[in-house]
A protein has these predicted regions:
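Membrane-interface transmembrane-helix boundary segments in multi-pass integral membrane proteins
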Residues: 6-21, 160, 178-218
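Membrane-embedded alpha-helical segments of multi-pass membrane proteins
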Residues: 17-22, 73-83, 101, 131-139
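Membrane-interface helix-boundary motifs at transmembrane edges
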Residues: 31-42, 90-97, 148-157
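A glycine-rich, hydrophobic loop/mini-helix early in the fold
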Residues: 44-88
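Aromatic-anchored segments of alpha-helical transmembrane domains
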Residues: 49-58, 105-116, 164-173
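Membrane-interface helix caps and helix-loop-helix hairpins in membrane proteins
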Residues: 61-68, 92-94, 117-128
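Alpha-helical transmembrane segments in multipass membrane proteins, preferentially the mid-helix core
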Residues: 84, 137-153
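Conserved small/polar residues in nucleotide/adenosyl-binding loops
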Residues: 228-235
Length: 245
C-alpha cells in the first residue's frame, strides 16, 4: 500500500533531484554530439513525449480503472508535451510549437513538479507517471533550448498570452460539458494538493488571481534568456518596459 504523498517529503525531494540531474546530464551531453546525432536524439525525445501522451489516458482509464472524465489529455502540460514533441520531430520547425511549451511547460510543469497534484507517493503508479511525464516535458524544452539552440522571441510573448487566454474558453466549455470532477486547467477548482492557488479567492473567482499570476510567471520565465535579445546599450529594465509598453 502506498504512503500518502508529503509535499517536500523525502520521496518528493528525491524525485525533484533525480529529474533535475537527468535533464542536466542529457542537455550537457547533447552539446558534445554532432548535428545529425542531436537531431536524432531530439526525435527520440519527441517520440517518447507523444507516445506517452497518447498511451497515458488508456493506462490510467483501462489499466488502473481511473475515471475517464479527469484523465483526458487536456491540461496545459498535456498541450505542452504534444507541441514540444511535434516540434522536436519536425524537419521544418514551427517556432510557436517551441514557444508555447517554453512558457506553458517551464512555468506549468515546474510548478506541477514543485506542488504535485498527488494523493500517494511511490510505489503508486500515478507518482511515477506524474514525475516521468512532467520531467520529460522539461527535458524536451531544455534540449531544444540548450542543445538545438532555439530561443523564445520577445515579439511572440503577447501572441502566447493571447493564445493562452483564448484557450480558456474551450477548456471551460469542455469542463462544463463533461461535468462531474472534470477540472482541466484547474478552471473549476484548485488542485487537491497544496499549491499557490490555495492563496487565491474561492473558485471560480480563483482565476482572477491565477490568470495574471500565470502571465507574471511566464514573463519571469523569459527573463533568463532575455539577455540574448537585448539591443545595444539596453538594460533588462529597458527590455521589460519595451515588452509592457
Amino acid at each position: 500500500m502506498s504512503e500518502p504523498f508529503i509535499l517536500f517529503g523525502e520521496q518528493h525531494t528525491q524525485a525533484l533531484t533525480y529529474s533535475f540531474i537527468v535533464i542536466l546530464i542529457l542537455c550537457v551531453l547533447g552539446n558534445f554530439l554532432n548535428n545529425k546525432t542531436q537531431e536524432f536524439a531530439a526525435k527520440l525525445i519527441g517520440i517518447s513525449l507523444l507516445v506517452f501522451e497518447v498511451t497515458k489516458p488508456f493506462i490510467y482509464i483501462y489499466g488502473f480503472d481511473k475515471p475517464w472524465e479527469t484523465y483526458l489529455p487536456l491540461h496545459m502540460c498535456n498541450f505542452s508535451a504534444v507541441l514540444i514533441g511535434i516540434f522536436l520531430l519536425q524537419k521544418k520547425k514551427n517556432q510557436m510549437f517551441f514557444e508555447l511549451p517554453f512558457y506553458w511547460g517551464i512555468g506549468g510543469a515546474t510548478m506541477a513538479l514543485i506542488t504535485p497534484d498527488l494523493d500517494f507517493a511511490w510505489p503508486d503508479i500515478e507518482f511515477f507517471m506524474f514525475f516521468y511525464g512532467h520531467g520529460q516535458i522539461l527535458l524536451g524544452i531544455f534540449f531544444a533550448l540548450a542543445v538545438l539552440k532555439y530561443r523564445p522571441y520577445l515579439q511572440n510573448f503577447w501572441k502566447m498570452a493571447v493564445i493562452t487566454i483564448l484557450l480558456l474558453i474551450p477548456v471551460l466549455v469542455v469542463n462544463l460539458i463533461i461535468g462531474g470532477e472534470a477540472n482541466y486547467w484547474y478552471l473549476m477548482d484548485t488542485p487537491d494538493g497544496e499549491s499557490l492557488m490555495d492563496l487565491m479567492p474561492a473558485p471560480p473567482f480563483h482565476m482572477l488571481g491565477v490568470a495574471p499570476l500565470a502571465l507574471v510567471v511566464f514573463f519571469i520565465t523569459y527573463i533568463p534568456v532575455s539577455y540574448t535579445h537585448l539591443r545595444a546599450h539596453e538594460t533588462v529594465l529597458d527590455l521589460v518596459c519595451r515588452l509592457l509598453l
